[in-house]
């Protein structure tokens, strides 16, 4: 054996052998990292050196997280060998087969000397012989008995927003890596550290050490440009039940999977295909039935289409994906399959036919189409938006545009930023006007007198909006032929005017639920309240802004219960309202799906708020008003129950109903009685005229 080897070696010169080794090394050398990829690695290494070892990297889909953590493993491995002897073993946790195969292929390509093993299904890992173990969480949780608690030196979690799940936490517990005192670095990678069930990622991660989102990646040309188009469909999402922070799929599918809506989706695709020469479109549907209906419709219209659901076998799924990558399939449809883990960079169009309240899900769907590819310059994102889409996130809302009234066609990120700038400029003009009104009492008074008569204005104004005001103060204020009161009366009237101007001119739907208290709903069953209360020295009044978070019923063992948090106290309501604006802007500016405990709401000027209420809303509001009216009918001289019925059936908008339902959840009588008093006063004015 030795002589044979010597004979073979004798036929080659030493220099030729070395040359071939260099060629092999060069073929398999790690690719040059992008600047931000190296920055992410450096941030992780520095954090570990400083003692914070449970860390996260937030990177937009298409940013190359597999390349990053492969190089990170290599760098930490090299640092380890510089400091000590022994083996360095890395564990990569994934929750999908595609992610496991992708990580394995990348590691073997970049670092061929590493022994990479898979722990998944039929693949049984040889722990002792491995440098890197890529493990399916579902499989590893059943095979933990194979692993010594000290057998790994590094844990990488792919798609780490799943890491709060019990299975992940059990694995981390096994390796003594579930607390901030862990000796093993735990590094999570995700496009969005936000969970639909709101379980705190702080249980697994102590710090997000690096973040780079979609907008930055597009600006720096690491992701392709997106062009956004919104298409209005006849779908009222307000009655669709929700679970956690997204819609229940069955009722959502019943609403979306109709002949009319599916025809709109088809016609939109055909128009865009002809106009933009689309070649590879990915469609997200609600559920299997929805996807199958759309597949049949598209196929009947001559479109080469295929679909994947959870029922699709793995071999068939792989074949379908490969055909799509090869350009043989024009439209690939799915429901919840391709939000993570599958790279299809040839996608040049995304059809969002699955409305969602989840920012993270929307970011994942959009991100599927933004990878760079030689066949495209940009990706068309077509969002099908219901006429009443309260609480639904869309591409524009991710970019900071809250208006439901603006429609887009091929709008780039720069276009949307320009629109956002226009909206901000308009709001600034409103703010400047309100600030001027607040400078002096006289300015506020003059603004009211320009209406000719406050009483006439009350007669013509929206009834629910008027419940924001201290109605008795305004009625007193308009007496004596609208002559100005003086002294204390003047101060009280002026203060009421200020409250009216700020609350009624706010772009958000405030409600008044007590004589000196107002509320503003936030998504997620949380809300803001402003209380007008005595200052600490009892000598003056201040406005106290609080944020309320609703506790789950399983914690309270009863119906809604809230945890309040004091935000600001100020004698000037303007300062409090400015703080509200900052809070909501802060929530809306978190564009890349970071965890948000509170979420902002749509504008009170949104188109859906002017539409007719649902039958459920009408019935609910009428029952509440009827009950309050019956208990205090003696307080109303001219108002009859028929008048209440007329208001609910002909005058109340969906926005009004939403306000009343929210207000009555905070106080069951006051807001409803205030509305009845407004209706009484408006009827009295009509009778006099």
Curated annotation (Swiss-Prot):
It is found in: Mitochondrion. Keywords: ATP-binding, Helicase, Hydrolase, Mitochondrion, Nucleotide-binding. One of its GO terms (cellular component) is mitochondrion. SMART domains: DEXDc, HELICc. ATP binds at residues 59-66. PROSITE patterns: HELICASE_ATP_BIND_1, HELICASE_CTER. Gene3D superfamilies: P-loop containing nucleotide triphosphate hydrolases (3.40.50.300). Residues 265-438 form the Helicase C-terminal domain. Present with 172 molecules/cell in log phase SD medium. This is Putative ATP-dependent helicase IRC3. It comes from Saccharomyces cerevisiae (strain ATCC 204508 / S288c) (Baker's yeast). The gene is IRC3.
